[in-house]
């Protein structure tokens, strides 16, 4: 039995690269689709937001002389490409999936609104919400917080390449220890970088818990949904 009825799954664009330096690794993409299919079959309503960092990141573009607004718009389009790829992989595995876009671009995807997203979820579709918030200067973490709150998700699952939140970066500090759970206030006081401050504050103020977990290990998404204690739970 699933622990949550409706979730918002946040995936990074970089994670779609798999072992590549750029773009989309089809093996990784299909592994993610298979994991999502597993929990869809449990009856979970699944909203998804994917970043675009495997294709273009607005902030890094700005540091190289791009206009920040144009750079962020390029990043938003990158999230649409990733969303279409994941949608296609899900449909190929027999899962109904719809892409909604924060900026009008029919027929690529329907224009996002909360009520349509919830309607599609309740009809059994995986709903992939692309284009960030539709505005520059907001990260896809903030976009996923916003969408999670709007669709009234029970939890946001942040799929990453590490298995939770640590006292320090475990890839740099071998003495770093993992939290099984942590409060939003403690994240602030410790200065931990789970998401950017805007995204974290939105989740805290709207009482949306986050579970940070390793999405790159097959089967982990189902384990989280089954209530197994993997990853780190962030809560008020």
From Swiss-Prot:
InterPro entries cross-referenced by the UniProt entry: AceGlu_kinase-like_sf, Asp/Glu/Uridylate_kinase, Uridylate_kinase, Uridylate_kinase_bac
Enzyme Commission designation: 2.7.4.22
Keyword Kinase: yes
Key words, A-Z: ATP-binding, Cytoplasm, Kinase, Nucleotide-binding, Pyrimidine biosynthesis, Transferase
Catalytic activity: UMP + ATP = UDP + ADP
Cellular component GO terms, alphabetical: cytoplasm
Sites where the protein binds ATP: 10-13, 53, 57, 160, 166, 169
UniProt xrefs under Pfam families: AA_kinase
Pathway the protein acts in: Pyrimidine metabolism; CTP biosynthesis via de novo pathway; UDP from UMP (UMPK route): step 1/1
Modes of activity regulation: Inhibited by UTP.
UniProt-listed GO biological process terms: 'de novo' CTP biosynthetic process; UDP biosynthetic process
Listed PANTHER family: URIDYLATE KINASE (PTHR42833), URIDYLATE KINASE PUMPKIN, CHLOROPLASTIC (PTHR42833:SF4)
Complex and partners: Homohexamer.
Its biological purpose: Catalyzes the reversible phosphorylation of UMP to UDP.
Family the entry assigns: Belongs to the UMP kinase family.
Annotated protein name in UniProt: Uridylate kinase
Species of origin: Parabacteroides distasonis (strain ATCC 8503 / DSM 20701 / CIP 104284 / JCM 5825 / NCTC 11152)
């Amino acid at each position: 039995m699933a622990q949550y009825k409706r979730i918002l799954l946040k995936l990074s664009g970089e994670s779609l690269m798999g072992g590549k330096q750029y773009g989309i690794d089809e093996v990784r993409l299909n592994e993610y689709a298979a994991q999502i299919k597993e929990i869809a079959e449990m009856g979970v309503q699944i909203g998804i937001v994917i970043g675009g960092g495997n294709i273009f990141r607005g902030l890094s573009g700005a540091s190289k002389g791009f206009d920040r607004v144009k750079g962020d718009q390029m990043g938003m389009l990158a999230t649409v490409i990733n969303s279409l790829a994941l949608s296609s992989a899900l449909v190929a595995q027999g899962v109904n999936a719809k892409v909604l876009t924060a900026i009008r671009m029919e027929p690529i995807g329907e224009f996002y609104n909360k009520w349509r997203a919830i309607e599609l979820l309740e009809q059994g579709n995986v709903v992939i919400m692309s284009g960030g918030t539709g505005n520059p200067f907001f990260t896809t973490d903030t976009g996923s917080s916003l969408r999670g709150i709007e669709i009234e998700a029970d939890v946001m699952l942040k799929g990453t390449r590490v298995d939770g939140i640590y006292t320090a970066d475990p890839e740099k500090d071998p003495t770093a220890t993992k939290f099984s759970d942590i409060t939003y206030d403690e994240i602030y006081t410790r200065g931990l970088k789970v998401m950017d401050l805007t995204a974290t504050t939105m989740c805290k103020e709207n009482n949306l818990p986050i579970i940070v977990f390793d999405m790159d290990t097959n089967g982990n998404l189902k384990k989280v949904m089954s209530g197994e204690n993997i990853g780190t739970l962030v809560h008020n």
